[in-house]
Amino acid sequence: MVAGNRSAKLYTAGQNKDVPTSFGHTIHTHYTFAEVHSAYFEALALPGGFARYDYFSTANDDEFLRIIKEFAAENKPIAAVCTASILLGKTGILNNRHATTYQGENGRWLDQLATLGAQVTTEQICIDGPIITGSGPSSAIPVALKLLEMTIGHKTAESISDMMGF
């Protein structure tokens, strides 16, 4: 459950139920990608990751791409932090939309996002309709707060923001 009025629930999904992390830990997910259908969820949030740790293998996972496309087709909020914007771009949902991504590595990811059809910005957070993209790890909390605002309302998101000192 998410703090505030406790009306939001957070669920995790992965290619498998046990997902190894870049730093040697394992995340036990609630669902596999095949089990996720947008009809049962209000929003989608995607964390970024490191290319050198095979983060982008999900870009070749048909079930993962289906999930993104389903949420986009239903105009449901989608949040992507850091390099997760690249995964959104690979589905085509960022074509002619404003978006941002990780700005380090001499703009490598910004350039890739542009080649995927996005209108690239260098803002910390970019909102284009129901899609929220964040520029890097430091954008994670502001992106999450915006996603909460879109799903459970401004007042609750503001209350959570205040509790967290933002």
Regions found by a protein language model. Give the residues of each.
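Catalytic, metal-anchored helix/loop core of enzyme active sites in primary metabolism
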Residues: 82
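Cytochrome P450 catalytic-domain "roof"
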Residues: 127
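A short beta-strand/loop micro-motif in the catalytic core of glycosyltransferases
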Residues: 78-79, 99
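A conserved active-site-flanking secondary-structure segment within enzyme catalytic domains
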Residues: 94-121
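Extended, subdomain-level signal for the structured scaffold at the beginning of enzyme domains
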Residues: 1-78, 86-90, 112-122, 131-166
